[in-house]
Amino acid sequence: ASRELWVTFGVKFLGVMAYKVTVLTLALWLMVDFGYGDAGAGNLVAAWSVSMTVVTLLVGSLTDAIGLRRTFFLGVWICVGARAVMAFTTIKWLALAAGLFPLAVGEALGTPVLVAAVRKYSTTQQRSISYSLFYTIMNLGFLVAAFLFDYLRQSLGERGQLTLPLVNCQLSTYRTLFFAAMVIEIAILPIVYFIRRGVEVTDDGIHVTPEAPRQAGDNLWSAFWRTVGEGAKGTLKLFRGLVQQAGFYRLLAFLMLIAFLKLIFMQM
């Protein structure tokens, strides 16, 4: 198996751990730290889940435009930043606007891309066992996350506090759980670095397509903004073609159904 396939498995394990800890914490954090009622917290979690589903529709076009590796990095950095806001801020509007809903974007950038990565980085013979391992690792990550959630919550108590050394910052029980999820998310970054640029696995072997060289005279920032612009244009072009397909609306209906099923499981 290619190195990139093992990297994908590692990213999946850590990613679902961070995601599951977050999902288990969300409603309790909203109620205990910000005083929301059960219905209000449920409505916000519902909006978060639906927004994640909506962003998922755009991810395929974005990935085609900027590539798997860049999409991985973009999603992880957004998740790290959003979880940092949720862990350290006590300002309600900031936690929601710069934490909760950006996190939906970051999570949406990761999940479908990982599924595509398994296909891209495995041969035809490896694909069946690769997807079996992928979903086994996902369930293992959920299991470990549940134990981590229970351990931290029981250790600190419902309204406990954790004082971080060096910075002398106090975190509530549920912000501590977001902090733990952020640390797990940060651990993904060095793993993603091992994905080689332009790699694709076929039945004939591993092929590496060199990236186009940067234009002469470009500095880092100008190259970055040009990549952003080209990625945005490519994403919009691909998405316009997508919405003209009849199957797109069937997919949309299916994803909305999945979103509401997720809400049911999150409230159980």
Please place each PLM-identified region on the residue numbering.
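C-terminal ends and interior cores of transmembrane alpha-helices
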Residues: 77-92
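Intracellular loop-helix junctions on the cytosolic face of multi-pass helical membrane proteins
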Residues: 1-3, 126-128, 150-266
